[in-house]
């Protein structure tokens, strides 16, 4: 709450690990949540961020921004995250691999690959846009 009192801008919290953590953060004035397992480095047995999306979205409602930043390796991972209730995904490894392989052009290529994979996933689901996925995608997901 002290940080919220000192910062007038948007405030995002990274790393809530339960819906109750998320609710508490929102009650303290947080505008958005970044669901992360910190690359699996700090606590390798923590719940996967993808498994938190739906329960956290249900806990905090549609007004709070949800960004997923772990486990995004393929465009279909982005589709699943959006279908479960995320507003966006952050990527780390994909663009770093692109950078290492081809510099700036490699980054562009990595983003193009993710975009193509995401679009293909939408089309295979019979959808044209992310908005359709957000509205109807959850019913298409099958539990692993």
Kindly give the residue locations of the regions a language model identified.
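Alpha/beta enzyme core
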Residues: 1-68, 75-97, 130
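C-terminal helical cap(s) of enzyme catalytic domains, especially alpha/beta-barrels
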Residues: 45-58, 99-119
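Alpha-helical hinge/cap motifs
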Residues: 70-71, 126
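Charged C-terminal helix
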Residues: 116-144
